[in-house]
From Swiss-Prot:
The lineage of its organism: Eukaryota, Fungi, Dikarya, Ascomycota, Pezizomycotina. It catalyses: L-phenylalanine = (E)-cinnamate + NH4(+). The keyword Lyase applies. There is a cross-link at A183-G185 (5-imidazolinone (Ala-Gly)). PROSITE patterns: PAL_HISTIDASE. Hancockiamide D displays potent cytotoxic activity against murine myeloma NS-1 cells, suggesting a potential antitumour application. More interestingly, hancockiamide C, the likely end metabolite of the hkm pathway, shows potent Arabidopsis thaliana seed anti-germination activity, but is inactive against the monocot Eragrostis tef seed, suggesting that it could be a herbicidal lead targeting monocots. The herbicidal activity of hancockiamide C could be due to its phenylpropanoid-like structural features, which may act on the plant lignan pathways, and hence warrants further investigations. Signal peptide: none annotated. Its EC number is 4.3.1.24. SUPFAM superfamilies: L-aspartase-like. One of its GO terms (biological process) is L-phenylalanine catabolic process. This is Phenylalanine ammonia-lyase hkm12. One of its GO terms (molecular function) is phenylalanine ammonia-lyase activity. It comes from the Eukaryota.
Length: 700
């Protein structure tokens, strides 16, 4: 089955998943029929508690029942069927008539994972859990139920409904985190889920929402809740454990978040372009049309959409000083992001197909009444999807790291304060720690990007000489999702601060012209003609603004003095050409000295007043592109992360009631604010805003 979202742009796929998720959440249920399970359905059941139920469609029910009856007919005719009356794997040369015991023997060999007392809640909290998170287990349960509902596995309706009943009653088996090589599927994790539905007292489960509460033996949990135990039929243990459900389920959770992070990387790129007053020209359609890769064209278009109407990003016709073109982290962002979008789309197709596939062995064709021994359990397609996704995340993280560093570094950020401090940099280092954290995140992310598939080891009597390691790859890719989410939170925090400081700077520049104009008039109106005063004033304003951009490492008072001194050559040069000879007796040095002192004082006062007003009320949104405005507003108001005012923000045990708050809000550490953004990203509450910023619904 091909994904219903293909072919399409990446943002269309991301939006479709998000809309499907919220539709499922709104309806409160997901129907399992073996053919239509989506990434969004898996997320809805595992993360949002949607009710999963087996379809009552006649075709689905008949296919399941026919596979069971076909198996029984073949057994009655004396056929030898792999895993039903033979041994398993490299031991398939053995035969037995003890069919029920054989299925129990399979579970015995597979329930070999490590779980400590702490993992089941009867010991001290472990420093590192050996059990899967509950949402992973729930995802596995819904994916496996969907796969065997296709009617190729001889798994009965009763067994499928037993798994779904655990989900419906919010019962989560405790499943070991490690131990599967995703060769004959994810045998070991699935064996613990099967153990739970048969009431194995050696398998543990939790009822309710607490992931760290004490788990009880599955037998006890089922008895307490009045849930009947399942007695497995001739192929049911094999049919339930022999499949790629664990890998496909975790990959679904990974991809849902990876799509969002890829979209967010385009948003943070646009925010960075605006904050650094970069050029929108880098994303002009002509450039993409000259090299028409689908991903590049989409990324460039999306970035431009976010910046539409921006008063900060430079257009193609504007006169620019400094670099004539942006550095690579901005100028080539669409070329960098584009291939990652293409890879994620392919990964999405692979996982969507896997969700709606039969992945056990042997497979039953109820029409021909034939059993086929094959290898659909080899989860290499899932590995392929996860390796691509993890590398894409590394590439996106690297771009965010480069852009973030550029915004923080005063040598690269086009005149923003060093470390993006809002106060004096001699005693405030706002984003320096964030810069260091980003380097730490990036280093770990780069390590995780290494392939897992190249580390395959031979297993199980050389029968499993090649194995996919799909679940291991998915685990590491989920770690990459976590790290890139942290980096994204940092990037959003840094970008919003940089945008605020840029607008604060522009507010201050607006105050400069009257200060310089009045100061020049007061000092030199008896010496220069009005037209000469106007010309010199404009040149001084330009020189002062340029000097302001190059002195961002200095405290405000020293900075104003330095800026004025740097502008003096302009004044002296213009004076020399403008003063007639009969005025040479005038004490120009005194006039210039008075101008220097007065202008410096008024400039500093204007900066302090502008800064004070801005700390109370930010007018940043007036300058932002429409998409950037939506993101900025979400961070500042929906998430509640404010403009960082500097050293005064640091919480202290010595704070009085009056100093423990700023502008009516509490103080937090820098990491405390970033953590709020991180949580909003992970709980999906910002996805709608991100989608709207990149592709407003009205424009679809």
């Amino acid at each position: 089955m091909l994904s219903k979202y293909q072919p399409s742009a990446h943002i269309a796929v991301t939006r479709a998943h998000w809309e499907d998720l919220h539709q499922a959440i709104s309806s409160g249920k997901v129907t399992i029929d073996g053919n239509s399970l989506t990434l969004a359905d898996v997320v809805a059941v595992s993360k949002f508690g949607c009710y999963a139920r087996l379809s009552e469609n006649r075709e689905t029910i008949d296919a399941i029942n026919e596979s069971v009856s076909t198996l029984q007919e073949c057994l009655d005719e004396g056929h030898h069927i792999y895993g039903v009356n033979t041994g398993f794997g490299g031991s398939a040369d053995s035969r037995t008539d003890h069919l029920a015991s054989l299925q129990r023997a399979l579970l015995q060999l597979l329930q070999s994972g490590i779980l400590t007392k702490a993992d089941i809640g009867s010991g001290d909290t472990p420093s590192q859990s050996h059990a899967m998170p509950p949402e992973w287990v729930k995802a596995i349960m819904v994916v496996r139920s969907n796969s065997v509902a296709r009617g190729h596995s001889a798994v009965s309706i009763g067994s499928i409904e037993a798994i779904l009943r655990l989900l419906q009653r919010d019962i989560t088996p405790v499943v070991p985190l490690r131990g599967t090589i995703s060769a004959s599927g994810d045998l070991m994790p699935l064996a613990y889920i099967v153990g739970a539905i048969e009431g194995n007292p050696g398998v543990f489960a939790r009822a309710g929402k607490s992931p760290h509460g004490q788990a009880l033996p599955a037998q006890q949990v089922l008895e307490q809740l009045g849930i009947p135990r399942i007695t497995l039929g001739p192929k049911e243990a094999l049919g339930l454990v022999n499949g790629t459900a664990a890998s496909a389920a975790l990959s679904s959770l990974v991809l849902y978040e990876a799509h969002r992070l890829a979209l967010l990387s385009q948003v943070t790129t646009a925010l960075t372009v605006e904050a650094l007053r970069g050029s929108a020209e880098s994303f002009h359609p002509f450039i993409s049309q000259a090299r028409p890769h689908d991903g590049q064209m989409e990324a460039a278009s999306n970035i431009l959409t976010v910046m539409r109407g921006s008063r900060l990003a430079m257009g193609t016709s504007e006169v620019q000083t400094g670099l004539v073109q942006d550095r690579y982290s901005l100028r080539t962002a669409s070329q960098w992001i584009g291939p990652q979008l293409e890879d994620l789309l392919l990964a999405d197709r692979q996982i969507t197909v896997e969700l709606n596939s039969t992945t056990d062995n042997p497979l039953i064709d109820s029409v021909s009444r034939h059993f086929y021994c094959g290898g659909n359990f080899q989860a290499t397609s899932v590995t392929s999807a996860m390796e691509k996704t993890r590398l894409a995340l590394q590439m996106l993280g690297k771009l965010m790291f480069a852009q973030c560093s550029e915004m923080i570094d005063p040598s690269l950020n086009n005149g923003l304060p060093t470390n993006l401090v809002a106060d004096d940099p001699s005693l405030s280092f706002t984003m320096k720690g964030v810069d260091i954290s980003m380097a730490a995140y990036m280093s770990e992310l780069a390590y995780l990007a290494n392939p897992v598939s190249s580390h395959v080891q031979t297993a199980e009597m050389h029968n499993q000489a090649v194995n996919s390691l799909a679940f291991v790859s998915a685990r590491y890719t989920m770690q990459a999702v976590d790290i890139v989410s942290m980096m994204s939170a940092c990037s959003l925090y840094v970008a919003c601060q940089a945008l605020d400081l840029r607008v604060l700077q522009l507010n201050f520049f607006r105050e400069l012209h009257p200060i310089v104009c009045n100061g020049t008039h007061d000092a030199f109106h008896t010496i220069l003609a009005p037209k000469e005063l106007e010309r010199i004033t404009q040149q001084l304003v330009t020189a002062i603004q340029d000097a302001w951009l190059t002195t961002s490492r200095m405290d405000a008072g020293d900075r104003c003095q330095r800026v004025i001194k740097l502008s003096l050559p302009i004044l002296l040069n213009e004076m020399r050409g403008a003063i007639p000879s009969d005025r040479q007796q005038v004490d120009l040095l005194t006039s210039i000295g008075n101008w220097e002192e007065a202008t410096c004082y008024k400039m500093l006062e204007a900066y302090k007043q502008t800064h004070e007003r801005f700390c109370r009320t930010q007018n940043t949104v007036e300058y932002l592109g429409a998409g950037s405005k939506a993101i900025y507003h979400a961070i500042r108001h929906k998430v509640g992360v404010p403009f960082h005012q500097g050293f005064v923000e640091q919480p202290s045990a010595d704070d009085l009631d009056t100093t423990a708050i700023i502008n009516g809000r509490e103080k937090k550490t820098t990491g405390g604010w970033i953590s709020l953004i991180y949580e909003a990203l992970r709980d999906d509450s910002l996805t709608g805003v991100i989608l709207e910023a990149v592709q407003p619904v009205r424009s679809i």
